[in-house]
């Protein structure tokens, strides 16, 4: 009887460890829906096919990006931006998705290969269970050796419906949001300034095989028995300083054509310069309840912690 009881306890603990985070019930904070303040664009108007063109289907404001054995797929914005509001509604592949990476990010690596900036929301398929996790990261001036990752569990199932993934990048701060809830803020002040992205960037939406990178050196590679892995993309919002159109020189305040005070882009205006009290409370909720990794707490990784961690 004792052996059976101990076996049952072990089984129970193991079962608990496999429970997806989105199976838990969360009461989410009420926040302003920033995504309601910007217009949506047609995919073809805002993006070009970056890679895997045969795995990209576009129908108006909806796109489907597919990862299979032949290739992943990626879109890149037709314009480069120096600050802006960037958002898309994504629906992730259901089922076993170990090694699958869906990325919504800003980068200028193609323009500045040795000193590039990057702001990432990366959605990582998990091994041994069907839930996904959120990873955020920031690079500036080619500082790729200093990973500034922070990782979060979802509070919903991202495979069952569309959800908003948003980046706010301006001269004040960078904010990462999921369903309009801020999960991370990276300010442009103090010790953070040396690591703050400052050059014009393009927006990318991609799905790719990240087995070697995302699953402990390939321990849990993509299993193409479950392919194709399809990511649905909708309601894309691109609002900011388009460098290509000459509305920004890459320095100074973010302005629309005209250059007057009244032409300040709202993304660099007062409403977006700081987080509201409700947004700060919501971010605190997300970080307390759902964040499970921060580079600033990883002392084994860094003998000398990045300056902003101090």
From Swiss-Prot:
Induction of the gene: Regulated by ATX1 and ATX2 by epigenetic histone H3 methylation.
PROSITE patterns linked: GH16_2
Active site (record annotation): 118, 122
Localization (cell): Secreted, Cell wall; Secreted, Extracellular space, Apoplast; Cell membrane
Record field: transmembrane: 90-106
Entry binding sites for xyloglucan: 122, 135-137, 145-149, 212-213, 217, 301
Record note on modification: Contains at least one intrachain disulfide bond essential for its enzymatic activity.
Signal sequence interval, chain numbering: 1-21
Site feature Important for catalytic activity, where: 120
Lipid bilayer topology: Single-pass membrane protein
Tissue-by-tissue expression: Expressed at low levels in vegetative tissues (roots, stems and seedlings). Predominantly expressed in green siliques. Expressed in flowers.
Cystines in this chain: 296-309
Gene Ontology CC annotation, any one: plasma membrane
Note: In contrast to group 1 and group 2 endotransglucosylase/hydrolase proteins, it may not contain the ligase activity, and may catalyze endohydrolysis xyloglucan polymers only.
Similarity annotation: Belongs to the glycosyl hydrolase 16 family. XTH group 3 subfamily.
Name of the featured protein: Probable xyloglucan endotransglucosylase/hydrolase protein 33
Species this chain originates from: Arabidopsis thaliana (Mouse-ear cress)
